[in-house]
Each structure stands twice: as structure tokens, then as C-alpha cells.
């Protein structure tokens, strides 16, 4: 019998090399360790199984017994509770949950929808459908379903927690706070609830208050177990982000280093150090990153983060060839899994040009909300938009906010739920809107952005870069808004994007062909806006700002109808929260050093120059 168990374990070890996220493999491995009477190994694998797929009832049942046997009664009670909950559910729901947990989302959705049709509203079935909606990023459906679940079962804490997560994902921070209140009242010391409360505070721009809260939670986690180290690492990461945003850089570095000390393979923490842009890695840290990058046990997402961090470390050390190789490795890994389809943006651009013509806008003169308060700073990432935001936010009449999602939310509403990338509903849907609907969208934008306007100044900045795709919509619903296109040298911009690992989105930045195609289409679309809305968009070239700061500032303020203020020249002295990767750079005076940084990599950027073409990237004479 023992020989059979050993053979099974050997086979499962081979399977784990290629399928490290397969919950059933961990479950089977845990059962083999139970047969061998190896409780610690069994607990480790069974915990891995239920972490990957919480619907594995057998895993929870076995963990209950193992925890009791080893004297961990608190964990035993939690495992028993999970098992009892699953045992109380109809088998169709449990089956669908298992499928969902193993990534069989289409089958799980079909099964649970059929169950709901036959059995009527069941809170746990509705919750699973909401989870599927969240996974698919159909957040409006997920929100409605969770709202129904917590209305039916107000004390369903797990569903309420997930409901709050969806509200946070939709940037509905006041609503999220209200939904979270019952959880905080029932269990005020619960870390999961307190972390959500901190996330909401961050979303509302209140970074200062979360710093002591993160530190308190870190202090409350004792012991040296794997779980304790992971939790401390996560909290130190979030603490570092808050400190960085508040310009407390030295403390942020300490927090990020504490995260790597708790989890040496924590790619996000290594990248956060690199993403400060001003931090320099020690030889010891570089050695740790190299080791973890090559370790097969390091998760893929951590390897991606570490590759980008190593690229930055080697760049700062002057090893440009090694740096370029590390960046390329990170991009290749990320591109393999991000599912980016270049044709989608290009199709949308063609549709924007077809719909948004001079005649289209002429027929709608006088439409929209005449509120002049928004200042949109848009363009490609890494084009100097954070610098422009900092300059404008240094003015006494202008409030800096963040990259606001509210225009994109309107686009999603116009797009509808049935996405057809070959023939999208948006922007064609703009042709069907009447004057009242257009005005409502303008009012909706102003109302939705109001929670971010903490200082109450007359003007505010929306720095979402991708809004350049929606200049036509912005002009239609907010005809008096200001629109600034942040532009940068194509080679410098594209290479800077290839070096950057974004927290989310910007999937076009992980391949040379992708970023070059995107840049060319961006230029084509901005040329279109200039043609159909002449003078509407102010283009600001980053290199011009560096060469002539005062002249550029006066030009920007004049376009915005704002009087000149010296504070805009001394923008680096402005004390405000800055959330983007350039936060440390805009807290310093302007230097020319960064303009030609890409040229140090020029021997390895021939493919990028070729992809951009001679018009955008001419060879030096």
C-alpha cells in the first residue's frame, strides 16, 4: 500500500511542475500524505487545495480532522464551518462552485443559471452568479446580484464582503463604506473588514488615516507561520503605497523592504521599490531577485514583477544589455497571458472617425452640460501627464484628483453588455442620443466625480490617459471642459512604457509591435480630433516643458483661462498625494537627464524604431 502511495505522490509531483494551480492535484496529494500519516505535509497540500478552490468539501473535512489531531482548534472550527456550509447546499450549487473554482466558468454559469430557473432565487446561487460576473468584469450585474443576496440574507458576511469588493472595483466608495458598516459593527477587529475600510479611504483620497491602521494590523499578526508572513507582507506593501503617495519615501522603502523580508519571492514588493524610480538596489537585493526569478516555485505573477524590478536595478547599475534582457523577459511573460488584441482599438478608432465628423458636432452645437470645471489631461502613459497634473494642481483654483474611471463608465453604459469587437455599439450609440440624454451624461460625470473633489476648488483634473479615445464624447457632454494632450518623443514614450509594469490595464505596452501600433493609432486619432474640433485640444510636448518651463506653464494656464501663479513653476514644492509611478519624480525640480535615457538602450531598440517607422522615429543624420 505504501509503495502505491509513494508512486502516486511521485506522479503528482510531476503533474505539479506543469499544473501548479490545479486544486484537485493538491487534494490528491494531501490524501496521499494522510495515508502516510504525515500530518504537516497533508495540511499544507489540503490548505493549498481549498485556497485554490474553496468549494472542495472533502478538503475542508480532512483539514478539520487534521487540525483537531494537531491541537489547532481555531483552524479546525473554521474548516468545520466551511464543510458544514457546503454540506447544507443543494448538490447542483456545490458542483457549480467546484467548476468555478477550477476555472470552468462557462460550464459553472450554465449550470447555476439552469438551477436558478428551476429552483427560483437562492442566495448562494445568486452569489455564485455574482462571483462569475465579477470574474468576467460585468460589474453592474455582479453589484445587482450581491445587492439582492444581502437584502435576502443581511448577515451573510461572506457575500457582503464580496459585495463591498465589487463596489470598490466600481469606485463607488461612499456606497462601499455604507455596505461595509454592518461587518465592522459585527466584527470590528476583523482584518479583512479593516483592509476594505482602508481601501475605501484610499479611494476617497484619505491616505493619511490608513497609515496607522496598516501599522496596527501588522503589529497584531504574531508568529512565523507561512500565513502570518504572507499577511504581514501584504500589509507592508499597502503601507508602502500609502507612504509613497504621501511623499514619505524613506518610510515607504522600509515598508517595502519589510514585505520582501517576510516574502522574498514577493514580486509586487520588489517592483514597488523599483517603481519609486529613485531607489537604488543593493547587490544583495539584486542577487535575491535573480535567485527568485529562476526558482520554479516562484509564482508566475511574482516572476513577472521581479523581471521588471531586475530590469530597473540593472539599468541603474549601468548594465543596459542585462536590463534590456530582463525587461524583455518580463514583457514576454506578461504578454503571453494578457490576451491583448490590437485590432479592437484600431476598429474603435475607425468608428470614432466615421461617427465624429464636423457635421456630427455642428448638428449638436449647444448640447451637453456647460460646466467648465473639468480639465482632462490625456494621452499615452509615461508621456509627462503627471508633471502637467502637478503643475496645474499647484494652482490655487485647481484640484488634482487621480485617474478617474467615470468617462470609461459612461462608455461601458453606451457600449452595452453584448460586446462585438468587430462592430461595437460605441461610438455609434452617440448618434442615437438626444440633447436631454447628452446633458444627463454630463451631469452624471460631474456627480460621479464629486467625491474626489475634496478641496472644493473651482476646477479639477481628470488624468485618465486613455480618455484620448473619447475626446468626441467628452466634447459632446462637457463642451466647456478643457482637454490637454500630453505628448512625448515616440521612442522615449514607447520604451518608457515597455519598461513599466502597470497595476492594471495598458495591455498594449508589453510588446514592441503592440506599443508601436498603438502609438501610431493614437497619433492618427489625435490628428482626427484636431481636424474635426480645431483648437479644442491643447497639445503639450514634454520636451518643450523641460526646455521652457515658464513659457509652457503660461501657455497651459492661458488655455485653461487661469491667471499665472508662481506656485505652478515651483510645482515640486506642492504638498499633495500623487498616485502614479512618476510621483517621486514630480516632487523634484525638472532635470533634462531623463529626456535621452532611452538612447542608452538604442543598440537594442532597432525593432522598435522599425515598428514606429521613419515618420515617427527617423534615424539620426
Regions found by a protein language model. Name each.
Residues 271-274, 286-297, 306-374, 423-457, ...:
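PAPS-dependent sulfotransferases, especially Golgi type II membrane carbohydrate sulfotransferases
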Residues 1, 35, 69, 101-102, ...:
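Register position in tetratricopeptide repeats
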Residues 24, 58, 90-91, 124, ...:
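Start-of-helix register in tetratricopeptide repeats
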Residues 367-476:
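Phosphate-binding active sites in nucleotide-utilizing proteins
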Residues 18, 52, 69, 85-86, ...:
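Structural marker of alpha-solenoid helical repeat scaffolds
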Amino acid at each position: 500500500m505504501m509503495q502505491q502511495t509513494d508512486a502516486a505522490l511521485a506522479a503528482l509531483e510531476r503533474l505539479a511542475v506543469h499544473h501548479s494551480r490545479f486544486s484537485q492535484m493538491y487534494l490528491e496529494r494531501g490524501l496521499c500524505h494522510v495515508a502516510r500519516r504525515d500530518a504537516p505535509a497533508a495540511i499544507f497540500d489540503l490548505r493549498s487545495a481549498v485556497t485554490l478552490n474553496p468549494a472542495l468539501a472533502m478538503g475542508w473535512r480532512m483539514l478539520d480532522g487534521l487540525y483537531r489531531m494537531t491541537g489547532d482548534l481555531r483552524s479546525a472550527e473554521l474548516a468545520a464551518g466551511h464543510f458544514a456550509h457546503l454540506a447544507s447546499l443543494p448538490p447542483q450549487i456545490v458542483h457549480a462552485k467546484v467548476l468555478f473554482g477550477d476555472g470552468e466558468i462557462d460550464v459553472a454559469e450554465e449550470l447555476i443559471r439552469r438551477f436558478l430557473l428551476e429552483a427560483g432565487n437562492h442566495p448562494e446561487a445568486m452569489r455564485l452568479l455574482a462571483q462569475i460576473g465579477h470574474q468576467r468584469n460585468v460589474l453592474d450585474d455582479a453589484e445587482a446580484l450581491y445587492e439582492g443576496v444581502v437584502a435576502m440574507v443581511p448577515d451573510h458576511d461572506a457575500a457582503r464582503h464580496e459585495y463591498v469588493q465589487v463596489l470598490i472595483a466600481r469606485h463607488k466608495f461612499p456606497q462601499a463604506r455604507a455596505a461595509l458598516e454592518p461587518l465592522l459593527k459585527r466584527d470590528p477587529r476583523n482584518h479583512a473588514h479593516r483592509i476594505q475600510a482602508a481601501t475605501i479611504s484610499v479611494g476617497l483620497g484619505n491616505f493619511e488615516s490608513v497609515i496607522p491602521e496598516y501599522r496596527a494590523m501588522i503589529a497584531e499578526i504574531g508568529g512565523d507561520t507561512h500565513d502570518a508572513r504572507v499577511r504581514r507582507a501584504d500589509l507592508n506593501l499597502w503601507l508602502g503605497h500609502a507612504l509613497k503617495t504621501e511623499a514619505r519615501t524613506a518610510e515607504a522603502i522600509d515598508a517595502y523592504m519589510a514585505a520582501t523580508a517576510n516574502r522574498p519571492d514577493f514580486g509586487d514588493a520588489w517592483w514597488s521599490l523599483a517603481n519609486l524610480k529613485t531607489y537604488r538596489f543593493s547587490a544583495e537585493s539584486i542577487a535575491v531577485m535573480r535567485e527568485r526569478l529562476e526558482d520554479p516555485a516562484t509564482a508566475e505573477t511574482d516572476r513577472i514583477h521581479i523581471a521588471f524590478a531586475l530590469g530597473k536595478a540593472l539599468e541603474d547599475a549601468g548594465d543596459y544589455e542585462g536590463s534590456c534582457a530582463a525587461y524583455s523577459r518580463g514583457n514576454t511573460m506578461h504578454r503571453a497571458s494578457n490576451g491583448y488584441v490590437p485590432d479592437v482599438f484600431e476598429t474603435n478608432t475607425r468608428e470614432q472617425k466615421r461617427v465624429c465628423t464636423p457635421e456630427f458636432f455642428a448638428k449638436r452645437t449647444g448640447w451637453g452640460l456647460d460646466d467648465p470645471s473639468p480639465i482632462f489631461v490625456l494621452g499615452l502613459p509615461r508621456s509627462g501627464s503627471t508633471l502637467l497634473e502637478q503643475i496645474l494642481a499647484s494652482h490655487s483654483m485647481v484640484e488634482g484628483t487621480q485617474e478617474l474611471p467615470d468617462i470609461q463608465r459612461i462608455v461601458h453604459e453606451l457600449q452595452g453588455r453584448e460586446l462585438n469587437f468587430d462592430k461595437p455599439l460605441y461610438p455609434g450609440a452617440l448618434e442615437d442620443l438626444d440633447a436631454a440624454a447628452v446633458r444627463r451624461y454630463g451631469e452624471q460625470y460631474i456627480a460621479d466625480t464629486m467625491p474626489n473633489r475634496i478641496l472644493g476648488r473651482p476646477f479639477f483634473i481628470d488624468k485618465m490617459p486613455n480618455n484620448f479615445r473619447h475626446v468626441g464624447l467628452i466634447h459632446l457632454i462637457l463642451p466647456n471642459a478643457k482637454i490637454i494632450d500630453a505628448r512625448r518623443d515616440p521612442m522615449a514614450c514607447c520604451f518608457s512604457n515597455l519598461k513599466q509594469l502597470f497595476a492594471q490595464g495598458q495591455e498594449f505596452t508589453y510588446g514592441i509591435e503592440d506599443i508601436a501600433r498603438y502609438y501610431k493609432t493614437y497619433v492618427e486619432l489625435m490628428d482626427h480630433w484636431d481636424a474635426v474640433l480645431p483648437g479644442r485640444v491643447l497639445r503639450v510636448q514634454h520636451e518643450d516643458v523641460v526646455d521652457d518651463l515658464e513659457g509652457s506653464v503660461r501657455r497651459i494656464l492661458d488655455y485653461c483661462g487661469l491667471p499665472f501663479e508662481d506656485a505652478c513653476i515651483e510645482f515640486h514644492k506642492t504638498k499633495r498625494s500623487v498616485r502614479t509611478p512618476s510621483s517621486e519624480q514630480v516632487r523634484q525640480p525638472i532635470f533634462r537627464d531623463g529626456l535621452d535615457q532611452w538612447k542608452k538602450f538604442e543598440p537594442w531598440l532597432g525593432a522598435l524604431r522599425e515598428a514606429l517607422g521613419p515618420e515617427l522615429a527617423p534615424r539620426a543624420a
